[in-house]
């Protein structure tokens, strides 16, 4: 039988405004629906708590100005820790698949961080990739981003990395933030 580990975010110290589209109610509603529909009663589906990303985890993939503490709240650390926990579940064979439902989001945060871009302060996908590399020695990784917005930050972080395949499936950049993600954006020059 297949198994699926689901990680929910449980801290809510980060908010833009009560009416902003990126708000905690989105995830709370999803959590409620999962429970109401009995998702966790299905054999093979289990719920897990996220880990917490430490400074060393964040700094493997980011340059934070002026400091990590200046750009990250506890929520950012737990959100990145949710992605790390999903990877850990699969790589340690505790689950065949894992899905992290976490916020705040991350795929617009670039390698150099000095504030937020598209509601993203740190790139949780990049933090997870570098954590996998550090803890398991896996170099070649594929990321498939299925958000309606182009994952421009993830693209930026791994642009010059020949060992990361990043695919962003998104709405046309001419009609939606961040206005990028076109066919000619297909990787930087190979490192010397």
Where are these regions (language model features)?
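Conserved alpha-helical scaffold segments that buttress catalytic/binding sites
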Residues: 84, 88, 99-192
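Metal-dependent C-N hydrolase catalytic cores
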Residues: 1-133, 139
């Amino acid at each position: 039988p297949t198994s699926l580990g689901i990680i929910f975010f449980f801290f809510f110290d980060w908010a833009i405004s009560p009416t902003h589209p990126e708000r905690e109610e989105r995830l709370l509603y999803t959590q409620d629906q999962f429970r109401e529909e009995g998702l966790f009663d299905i054999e093979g589906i289990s719920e897990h708590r996220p880990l917490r990303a430490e400074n060393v985890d964040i700094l493997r993939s980011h340059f934070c100005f002026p400091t990590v503490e200046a750009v990250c709240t506890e929520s950012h650390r737990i959100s990145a820790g949710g992605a790390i926990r999903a990877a850990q579940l699969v790589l340690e064979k505790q689950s065949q698949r894992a899905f992290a439902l976490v916020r705040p989001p991350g795929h617009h945060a670039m390698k150099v961080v000095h504030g937020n871009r598209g509601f993203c302060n740190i790139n949780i996908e990049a933090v997870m990739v570098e954590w996998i590399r550090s803890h398991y020695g896996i170099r070649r990784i594929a990321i498939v981003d299925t958000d309606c917005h182009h994952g421009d930050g993830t693209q930026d972080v791994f642009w010059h990395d020949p060992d990361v395949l990043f695919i962003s499936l998104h709405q046309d950049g001419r009609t939606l933030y961040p206005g990028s993600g076109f066919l000619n954006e297909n990787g930087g020059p190979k490192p010397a």
